Curated annotation (Swiss-Prot):
It is an enzyme of class 3 (hydrolase). This is 2-amino-5-formylamino-6-ribosylaminopyrimidin-4(3H)-one 5'-monophosphate deformylase. NCBIfam families: ArfB_arch_rifla (NF033501). Homodimer. The lineage of its organism: Archaea, Methanobacteriati, Methanobacteriota, Methanomada group, Methanococci. It comes from Methanocaldococcus fervens (strain DSM 4213 / JCM 15782 / AG86) (Methanococcus fervens). Catalyzes the hydrolysis of the formamide of 2-amino-5-formylamino-6-ribosylamino-4(3H)-pyrimidinone 5'-monophosphate (FAPy) to form 2,5-diamino-6-ribosylamino-4(3H)-pyrimidinone 5'-phosphate (APy).
């Protein structure tokens, strides 16, 4: 069967060789305002939108996620579990003509899998790249992006509740003592959240989201040059 590769609103016929994968986390507390699967929903939104704008294939989501041992705000897997899931997606992607894989990651802990990307390239003879788009956990940026895509319950009462760091220690990781002690960047972000709190800024959310989508689109363009 000869496929009409030039049909539709696509950048170039070569874009059919690019597959976009969303990576995040399904089981993490995000305060009172955001759902436990915030990271994967944001990653999926960005990845799918970029696929629509470019014509690249959206290959779906990775279900496992991982995290640094000292960050305790959810239920996670080993980095190897993500690696094995990616092996499955890449193997199936190759069957439909994908030669270049772009992972859109919106969960900081998943950075731990970067060490496996070269192994995947070598095993399957493909290109594998990852874009990391991360925010201070459940803080202003993530709440604002979540609101824009429709997953945040950001009324005044919920936001006030969200800023109760004793009840929701994961917000900004303010109350995650072990994480703050082991990671200077986390501690600095937590201090900022303690000082300024968490607020909703729709304009900020739109800008962050649009910039993230543009970043993925630009990477797809680079991959088909």
């Amino acid at each position: 069967m000869e496929l009409r590769l030039s049909s539709g609103n696509i950048l170039d016929e070569k874009v059919h060789k690019v597959g976009i994968i969303a990576l995040g986390s399904f089981l993490e507390n995000h305060g009172a305002v955001l759902p436990i699967d915030t990271d994967i929903k944001i990653a999926s939104y960005i990845a799918l939108k970029a696929a629509i704008l470019t014509g690249a294939k959206f290959l779906g989501v990775v279900i496992p996620s991982t995290e640094y041992e000292y960050v305790k705000h959810g239920i996670h897997n080993k980095p190897e579990d993500i690696y094995y899931y990616l092996r499955f997606l890449i193997n199936e992607g190759k069957k439909i003509g994908v030669e270049k894989f772009l992972i859109v990651n919106c969960h900081g802990g998943n950075i731990l899998i970067e060490k496996f990307l070269k192994d995947l390239e070598y095993e399957f003879g493909v290109k594998v790249e990852m874009i990391n788009i991360a925010f201070t956990h459940a803080a202003t940026e993530e709440v604002s992006v979540g609101y824009v895509i429709g997953i945040a319950k950001a009324d005044e009462k919920s936001l006030k509740e969200h800023n109760n760091f004793e009840k929701y220690p994961e917000v900004g990781m303010v109350g995650l003592k072990e994480a703050r002690e082991n990671n200077k960047a986390i501690d600095e972000e937590a201090k900022a959240v303690e000082k300024f709190g968490v607020r909703l800024d729709k304009n900020l959310g739109e800008k962050i989201l649009n910039d993230a989508i543009e970043k993925v689109v630009d990477k797809v363009k680079e991959m088909i040059r």
